[in-house]
Amino acid sequence: MLAADGGKGTPRQIGIADADPGSISAAVWSPDSRQMAVLATSNHGTPALFDVSATGANVRRVALIPGAVHGPKFSPDGSRIALLYSSPSEESNGPTQATPRDTGAMDTHIDRQHLAIVDVAHGQMKVISKPDLYVYEFDWSPSGREFVVSSANGSGNNNWWVARLEAIDASRGAVREIAKPAMQIAQPLWSPDGREIAFIGGLMSDQGSTGGDLYTVPATGGAVHDVTPNIKVSLTTFRWRNAGSVLATMLSHGASEIGTVDAHTGALQPLWSVDESILSGRTRGIPEISATTDGSAVALVRESLATAPEVWAGPPGRLTQLTHANTGARPSWGKAVNVQWHNDQFNVQGFLIYPMNFDATKHYPMIVLIHGGPSAASGSSFIAENSEQAELSRDGYFVFMPNPRGSYGQGEAFTRANVKDFGHGDLRDIMAGVDAVIARYPVDGKRLGVTGWSYGGFMTMWTVTQTNRFRAAVAGAGISNWLSYTGENGISEWMVPFFGATAYEDPAVYAKSAPINYISHAHTPTLIIVGERDAECPAPQSFEFWRGLQHEGVTTELVVYPDEGHHFANPEHQRDVLRRDLAWFDKYLK
């Protein structure tokens, strides 16, 4: 762990002798900035909470906490640390991890996450939330007597989409409802004067991938108020500056922005914008910062498709680089450009990566890489050397990463534009982008491929049933049949906000977006990849599409990776996916 003094000094290392090497997962400042709460593991894997002085001279293990712990926050007086806690018997794999095999009686295990308080002086921990309540996020009230939480009853993996705002008494655990917004909610924060709760609300497909408008609600409960109903950006994080203003990060047409928002009028004052990604540890690709209490200074990691990540700090717009850890790192892929085009009523945006060793006298094949989500966005981040984009670029491909309607970056109306319309307007946006790229860059329009994972996998399956312009496709963890998917996946609550009803209540709205219903139109050679134990996009969805393509005489191959979930964890499997991906495109596009 490194610390630096306000952007002025050389970062210094702080060691925690009792922590397992490389195990630090969180570090937060106390209100007086004299100490930090640090989460790590100790004794070969047991989660532990440490109290560390700002200089690093004094380090004390406050508590060993068997189970899982996340998100520590000091109380306003610094005497207590609240955190999210699951006991060993209540822990569960997240929705993107490999799910346990479904055998025996179903629904007997309910994953739970509690709100707990640790006394800093004595190390005693007390769980204060109700046993049947899953707490996703929380914030202390300014008095330290209450918490605001986003929470839901039942298993946490499936119920984040229907979470509500509640207040929990910090001493007795009594619960009162503040609001039940008709959208997904993230980052509830109490105002400094204690009168309001602010949060980001919007259509969100995944916890942690945050984007939407700024909302407020009285701390005593009542109607929620959309403070920023017409902004053309997606708010991703914020913090209160004072009782009437917040400092926010935003995603805007592929750029990361910092600005202030009046918490009552919604007036937005931009402070800084950069065609890069900025982050501070939550979700890569979603702009986020760490900031002083008054918002006058920030700390963040800057990176782009051209520059490796480094830590910067200072007033927004006048940042100083603190680290030079990646000075020698250079992209192992071609240059990247921000591309914009018009379709229907939207100005759409995406990124285009050139082939490595580009020769302006040649035309190159292009792969369209569709992001997951759909509530997300492809951004300008320093991708891994062994990422799909880098490998394709080095192999002589343009890589086009569109952000069609349904993505973040252009306001909530744009994000909501694919509700009840999966695969239709978003595909039109993508194909208009393909045409725009072909018109402006040396792309061979007869050598196109398409790929994606999760929502991108669904879109790949959908695309090959709607157009024959692509000569090859690779569909990762896709969805082919919404009706059967409803009975197979472990997070079905996410579907209702996007389709307006369950598949049992309105099968028609799902049927019009199901690739399997248009399988007779498919002709594109398609490689299908999925994890054996994927709970988000279960393997049977890939089997259905594979069988359908076989029935239609389409060249296809299905590869199921053992013991993998939605996000593959085994490095050998990750490398094998890339190898097969490149070989498939090379076979049909080279």
Where do the PLM segments sit?
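A flexible loop/linker signature enriched in serine peptidases of the S9 family
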Residues: 1, 17-24, 37-50, 64-70, ...
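N-terminal, post-signal-peptide region of Sec/Tat-exported proteins
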Residues: 1-13
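Short loop/turn segments that connect beta-strands within beta-propeller blades
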Residues: 4-7, 53-57, 119-123, 169-173, ...
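Beta-propeller fold detector
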Residues: 10-15, 60-63, 126-129, 176-179, ...
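Residue-level detector of Asp-centered blade-edge/turn motifs that repeat once per structural unit
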Residues: 31-32, 76-77, 142-143, 192-193, ...
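Hydrophobic beta-strand positions that form the internal "hydrophobic ladder"
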Residues: 33-37, 78-82, 147-148, 194-198, ...
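Serine-hydrolase catalytic core recognition
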Residues: 285-590
